[in-house]
């Protein structure tokens, strides 16, 4: 490929709405062009990256025994109505109606359609296992699309779905796919972690996220440097504190804290560690009638240490809160506590509440909490003396760095990541909802055991950039770079020797199967180098009249600070030896 034939379009400045590095660089490098909110044209340079990502994913899916299929982007609503997702999913599910008044959805995923394929085509256990995958456009009507391809509305995703005869076989299929994902991300040349994830309402422990490590990542990844333990923040368990609760050493006291409504402010005022304070979080659950009207509400009080944050996923596993909860209204709080938020606590309640205590708080002594009175807190609070021993103690918090690892092999550390893949054991959730069965070996119908497996095809290049960039631009891994090598001849329009040498190297690399581009645009060296550094091509060869007369060319990897002089006769072998695909 020659640059004069290709579409090379770079910008000196990023658009004003570009917030993260990947969005800025993908736009400046001419990889994407915004068409609307969360909707982008994949320009030729960007499409080359996407196609390389797709090729690796497709190779490994096929190697793992999955079979490619393509399902419609626009799907009849009746399939989604069978599972209830047509009504349950929020406005992120784009619903449309055709000229005949029939309802459709623009697919965000394809569980319903693939389950329909299975129930029509897979009739016997003899046809199992099967794994169908597609690489297809998806759409989610995000309320606030942002970060370019990281959180767009239209995107490309690889989604695979496995069908098995029983749970054991389904779990085996899950492991096959999890290993395929590891091969995929290894081939991409990215630093990543496979982390245990919460399985949601389905339960079980078969759910893993694949996170590309990046300081700008939205997700917190918890891991143990001393072992293989890794989980996302939702999943990571905060172990119960070891050892007995300390004995009470302070008297209970009502203490003035004028204008201090946060744990941090109270701790500073009283000259105590933040860890001596307890925060009160007030939730509510609702009981509804057949019409969906609320007939009864229950108020809950959660107690967490002042320096800890609530983990909503863990809270949602507490019996009584597992059917759904919300934060209590100000009116509900005032009715039960007689006080506005900021000074709440478990003492001196107006109406009873259901109390849930975090493991850490359950072993605290002489702690501080709100007095249910504006500008006052209670100090020297102790279990068994000032309050009954807590009935419900649970892990309610996010772990923090330095907590003991759940596997008992060290302490936890936390880093940031970007989720680019997820493998998930589904069980019979969709097959039961759609009555998708096959005849088992005993001649009786049985529901398919399913798994689903996703990779964000267009999200992955953005994640790669967040991990691999510098002040000059993108630094692509060889495997997914738009071009692996760029040949940059200086004065090609003025020197027959430079032109001939550049075209020969270009031709030789093409013949050897190397993805190379020859920059024949006639740009000044500085502008030419700046373009390819911004675009992020990993390997650059510079040919000049002076260098060729000395029998040398210059090679520079995108990560190198300076170029290396290489004998002209050796450059082909030199480059081939350094390409890592």
From Swiss-Prot:
Gene3D superfamilies linked: Anticodon-binding domain, Bira Bifunctional Protein, Domain 2, YbaK/aminoacyl-tRNA synthetase-associated domain
Matches recorded under CDD domains: ProRS-INS, ProRS_anticodon_short, ProRS_core_prok
GO cellular component: cytosol
Keywords of the record: Aminoacyl-tRNA synthetase, ATP-binding, Cytoplasm, Ligase, Nucleotide-binding, Protein biosynthesis
Keyword Zinc: no
EC main group: ligase
Cell compartments where the protein resides: Cytoplasm
InterPro entries: aa-tRNA-synt_IIb, aa-tRNA-synth_II, aa-tRNA-synth_II/BPL/LPL, Anticodon-bd, Anticodon-bd_dom_sf, Pro-tRNA-ligase_IIa, Pro-tRNA-synth_IIa_bac-type, Pro-tRNA-Synthase_IIa_type1
Source superkingdom: Bacteria
GO biological process terms, semicolon-separated: prolyl-tRNA aminoacylation
EC numbers on record: 6.1.1.15
Reactions mediated catalytically: tRNA(Pro) + L-proline + ATP = L-prolyl-tRNA(Pro) + AMP + diphosphate
A GO term for molecular function: ATP binding
Quaternary structure, from the entry: Homodimer.
Assigned protein family: Belongs to the class-II aminoacyl-tRNA synthetase family. ProS type 1 subfamily.
Domain notes: Consists of three domains: the N-terminal catalytic domain, the editing domain and the C-terminal anticodon-binding domain.
Function: Catalyzes the attachment of proline to tRNA(Pro) in a two-step reaction: proline is first activated by ATP to form Pro-AMP and then transferred to the acceptor end of tRNA(Pro). As ProRS can inadvertently accommodate and process non-cognate amino acids such as alanine and cysteine, to avoid such errors it has two additional distinct editing activities against alanine. One activity is designated as 'pretransfer' editing and involves the tRNA(Pro)-independent hydrolysis of activated Ala-AMP.
HAMAP family assigned: Pro_tRNA_synth_type1
Protein name as annotated: Proline--tRNA ligase
